[in-house]
A protein has these predicted regions:
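Negatively charged, low-complexity tracts enriched in Asp/Glu with abundant Ser/Thr
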Residues: 1-25
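A short, sequence-level motif marking secondary-structure junctions
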Residues: 25, 52, 109-110
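Predominantly late transmembrane helices and immediately cytosolic-facing juxtamembrane segments
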Residues: 41-43, 49-52, 58-59
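Long intrinsically disordered, low-complexity regions that are acidic and Ser/Thr-rich
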Residues: 63-90
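Low-complexity intrinsically disordered segments
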Residues: 81-156
């Protein structure tokens, strides 16, 4: 049984993990992790997690903007990184770590998976990021539905 978070909700299902991809690189403070599943009944579940190692001080404007909650600094991970704007100290009693941002989409149509992964530049041109492209490349080897919409695109 798989569990995928969608904000504060949890999706539980049986199926197969088709692919995973991450934008993490050495030295990254923030990155995206994608997972693509196919349920036993044929639905696709696309999961995206925005990961952050950054923490803030109480006076940082990002605390309010992101809706961050205070925690005792002693529970910070050893990998936690102070915000470059507010420069909080790890020796502070209370800090405001950025939250992981969980998002998921359930769809019966593999086209909806691609549509969710497409980005648009300022001129309106559609493209796939490298992390999305890697996710789909592996998933296409595992699933005919993804392969049929990813490898060949019909242009009207």
């Amino acid at each position: 049984l798989f569990e995928v978070k969608d904000n504060t909700r949890t999706l539980k299902f049986s199926g197969k993990l088709l692919s995973e991809s991450s934008s993490w690189r050495r030295g990254s403070n923030r990155w995206i992790e994608f997972s693509l599943y196919k349920t036993d009944n044929g639905s696709y579940i696309l999961s995206r997690i925005g990961v952050s190692l950054i923490f803030h001080g109480a006076a940082c404007p990002l605390v309010k903007r992101y809706g961050l909650s205070e925690v005792n600094a002693s529970i910070l991970s050893k990998d936690a990184i102070p915000c470059e704007e507010c420069e909080p100290s790890k020796s502070a009693v209370l800090v405001f770590p950025e939250k992981y941002r969980h998002w998921a989409q359930v769809s019966d149509d593999p086209n909806a998976v691609l549509d969710a992964l497409y980005k648009y530049d300022q001129g309106g041109a559609r493209y796939l990021t490298k992390v999305a492209d890697r996710l789909l490349e592996v998933a296409a080897d595992e699933d005919k539905g993804i392969e049929s919409v990813y490898r060949i695109e019909l242009i009207p």
